[in-house]
Regions:
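Amphipathic alpha-helical interaction surfaces in cytosolic regulatory modules
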Residues: 20-82
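Short beta-strand/loop segment at the start of cytosolic alpha/beta domains
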Residues: 1-15
């Protein structure tokens, strides 16, 4: 899994690619948490266009990110879920 980062009008866009599973979920969670903490309150969009698979562990990482974002007064959105 790789994660591309961009920013548009103050909104951080993270675009992971590949698989988010047991082996990669920690890196995904660290990247997401880092963006949320680094620019709190942050608006973050996670673009799943290039994700082939996300396991329950990956969904857990996303939920942790959502809770962290809410706690810091930010917003987290997801795009292109398949």
């Amino acid at each position: 899994m790789e994660i591309a980062r961009s920013q548009n009008d103050g909104i951080i866009i993270l675009a992971p690619s590949g698989r988010i599973d047991q082996d990669t979920s920690a890196a995904f969670q660290a990247a997401l948490s880092g963006e949320i903490a680094g620019a709190a309150p942050a608006s973050v969009v996670v673009d799943f266009t290039a994700i082939e698979y996300i396991s329950s562990v990956g969904l857990r990482a996303l939920m942790i990110g959502a809770k962290e974002s809410k706690a810091s007064g930010g917003k987290l959105a997801v795009a292109a879920l398949r």
